[in-house]
């Protein structure tokens, strides 16, 4: 340490009243400043976690649609049903994490185009409190797939839905942080012009969530 820097740090320490606190003391003090999260969490005791997620995700504000399947192997059929319902070509850009599924009858690619009509991705989890999806970037779950498709089909494991935001990230400090971590809450939209909600302004116009399990 340079003598100039040492002098500065010593002066700061003296001004603060002596020795610097240990990391444990600092952590304990910080935790004492954080209120119990339950104080600010919305109560929905009459609903199960998944029922709350369904209600929020399909609300008028978020405008997502839902399908439920029993197994991850059923995802391609759920996607085919969505294509048929919306008159779409059976073609999609999919996350590499889903490439091993049987996509017979659907033309797939793991590369995504700027004008992609349909993208199919795998969510890391969900949050019942807000109806949000959690996406972590990785080679198997590239982030652009969540934003470039006009129709975004997101695959979500039922057991990965947390009740509250805090629960979704409890213990996250033990995991390696991804390069990008995104929370997606409903379809893309803006109400900047005349307070009219325009869907698809900055991303997917349609969000379809396939819940597995």
Predicted regions located by residue number:
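The feature marks the mature, well-folded catalytic cores of soluble enzymes
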Residues: 1-213
